[in-house]
């Protein structure tokens, strides 16, 4: 009897209840014409279903993540700060902070307190979007524009010599002409996109005041609202938007991918994100799997079970920095292919899990670690020193910083309200030999060293160096991050 039950169970999983006649799927691109497509009506056995489902989960995780973020952020009735914390806006517009982001932020891991952030999501199949660029003068700035794959498109920022003015963001189907008064058209390969402006600000009262006028001109809106005049929003006094999840305490990043719902959303990704050259075969396998699941509840259940398993086995390990990028020396890893992932599915999903929305390598290089120089896990109950030899601070044309994150890759509030140190800090003290030592620990390293101290929570922590607009030594990897020494 047991053997009969097992056989029936297997048969339910294998049977994709579809017509037995074979059919060739329509080719997704001209290059696939004449290539045989998967046959419908085959009996997919459980291990095959699981193998393809695991690949689909790994491949599609960043795009489902992006989809869910967009649906949450664009519920805002007007541009502003959700809960007084996170910039949000209706679809086609943008919200801006007016100061550094706070420790209460859990929308995205690895925030930084060197820049003032903005955030907006766009559906460019509705119509193009205009985004404004003020005259930032000598201040570093970059607008990172991401498609649904989390690859950047367009070039907009100080590293590119972008002019102040108006820029048009267009989707793949838009066939209009560049309007008069618009500097350039920046075209995305997907219709779902988001923009994250990053505007550098010194950690001084004077610069906080000086930057406000420029921030108020960082505005985005649909093309049909464009009149050639620079619009302004007083971001500091814009009414806050209630956070619908304010009563749901969270110690980590918001869960943007729910495994049990992943394969309900995955068909939308296949529909809205066109394949890259050479990905047509992947799409064909994924679509055949979804067709089978749509006709057989047993197949669908196995997909859900596989998604739950894959979240634990495939995705969660990417939260460890050793699985993100490549070794950079002295126990650190460095980002690779950030925001221009292409076929690099490994680093795309690693970044989406651990530190989504990085900048391109020429805009920013990231160095990160969970370990000290001896290979031991960093823990905020201990104290550490990081010394940059004279002239060996990160060589940049923009700015650099060292940030401390808690076990969730977020800020843990401290009395100094200090979460990073670097270019923005005008009171860092150098050693007599010209070197610079920064300190990490739960207690002050001494009054004379306190300006160089990052207070740490008593839990596992990680350290993170940003090098914005790096010099050649940053780009080619010849610059190495310093050793992290545990202070005994």
Predicted regions: what is each one?
Residues 1-23:
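Gram-negative bacterial Sec-dependent N-terminal signal peptides
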Residues 25-488:
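A compositional/structural signature for long, glycine/proline-rich flexible linkers
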